[in-house]
Design a protein with these regions (language model features):
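Helical scaffold of the NTase/Pol beta-like nucleotidyltransferase catalytic core
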Residues: 1-112, 145, 151-157, 161
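Mature, function-bearing regions of proteins
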Residues: 62-64, 68-70, 181-196
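Conserved catalytic core of two-metal-ion nucleotidyltransferases
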Residues: 153-185, 189
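Expand to "…catalyze enediolate/carbanion chemistry for C-C bond making/breaking, isomerization
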Residues: 204
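Active-site nucleotide-donor binding segment shared across nucleotidyl transfer reactions
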Residues: 97-130, 134-139
Length: 204
């Protein structure tokens, strides 16, 4: 099994791993066998930071999971296909797929779309956004980012793309903008950088 990365969905979190003050809704989610999502946070060796997702946006619980407890892993890249759907977010996924495929970079849906495609549990609604991750191991020019954003903004709903660099993640919308520095999210926290691919700058 590959090493879990942010946005991957994991199955196998035992109830015994949850803290004593875990809310009832989170206990029910874990007990029902639903997956947890990998978070971007530092952990001790042998552990991964995960989040439990509830029915509403305010139902989110951060915790940790032993790597040895992972029974199954689904990455966003494995969730790219979807059948015709009345939900704007899934329609946006279908329209964005050929555009992103031409980039030559690995990508996939995260958030509610990824969760629904992975579990079959209906969590989307008419106002749902489409969250995507785009793996960018090498620098993407701001001009290219803006070109891609202009195309994606024609979709049936808002699309938010996270560019995953070797140092962390930055929003495509922010990287396509005019600000000299952008917010880079890493396991050690968030910081403003001028180049999200510059490891030395990100570690400074």
């Amino acid at each position: 099994m590959s090493t879990p990365r942010p946005h991957d969905l994991l199955w196998g979190l035992p109830l015994s791993a949850l803290p004593d003050d875990t809310p009832q809704w989170a206990l029910q989610v874990v007990a029902s066998g639903q997956p947890v999502v990998v978070r971007r946070a530092a952990c001790a060796d042998g552990w991964v930071a995960v989040g439990v997702r509830g029915q509403s946006r305010d139902q989110r619980l951060g915790t940790q999971m032993r790597l040895g407890d992972i029974q199954r892993l689904r990455s966003p890249e494995a969730l790219r296909g979807c059948a015709p759907s009345p939900w704007p977010a899934l329609q946006a996924l279908a329209s964005a797929a050929p555009v992103l495929d031409t980039c030559g970079l690995a990508w996939g849906p995260t958030g509610g779309v990824g969760y629904q495609l992975a579990t079959g549990i209906n969590v989307l609604h008419l106002a749902s956004d489409l969250d995507l991750v785009l793996r960018a191991p090498h620098p993407l020019t701001r001009a290219k980012a803006l070109e891609l954003l202009d195309i994606l903004d024609c979709a049936p709903c808002r699309i938010d793309v996270q560019l995953e660099t070797p140092a962390g993640a930055v929003a495509l919308r922010e990287w396509a903008g005019c600000a000299q520095r952008v917010l880079l999210k890493s396991p050690l926290g968030a910081r403003l950088v001028s180049d999200p691919w510059a490891a030395l700058e990100c570690a400074a």
